[in-house]
């Protein structure tokens, strides 16, 4: 699998953001199924590579794994904070699908995470 450390600008957050992406070495379909893997409060997106075997678990499944960094946002739009729910639910999938061959089909998208 390929591990990409990706930096991009978020219009909804108004700042540079990061996500780590695992991709299969070979495309087996025109658009990959995707696991959106969300970190917990005390960590960031890198925790999945540092403390789990996510690459080993997903190798051979023919799917992408997207691990975004959302800081301590609780993945919500805060009254006095940034619109992280909009970022995660709307903007990030569009950005990731434009950068990588990811399937937009509901049955090809999976969400998992820790804490928060």
Stretches with model-predicted labels:
Residues 1-116:
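Non-catalytic cap/lid and distal C-terminal segments of serine-dependent acyl enzymes
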């Amino acid at each position: 699998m390929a591990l990409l450390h990706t930096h991009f600008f978020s219009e909804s957050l108004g700042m540079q953001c990061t996500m780590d992406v695992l991709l299969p070495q070979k495309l087996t379909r025109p658009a990959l199924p995707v696991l959106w893997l969300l970190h917990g409060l005390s960590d960031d997106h890198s925790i999945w590579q540092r403390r789990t075997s996510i690459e080993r678990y997903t190798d051979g499944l023919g799917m992408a794994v997207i691990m975004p960094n959302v800081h301590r946002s609780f993945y919500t739009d805060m009254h006095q904070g940034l619109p992280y729910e909009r970022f995660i639910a709307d903007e990030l999938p569009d950005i990731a699908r434009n950068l990588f061959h990811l399937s937009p089909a509901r049955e090809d998208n999976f969400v998992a995470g820790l804490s928060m």
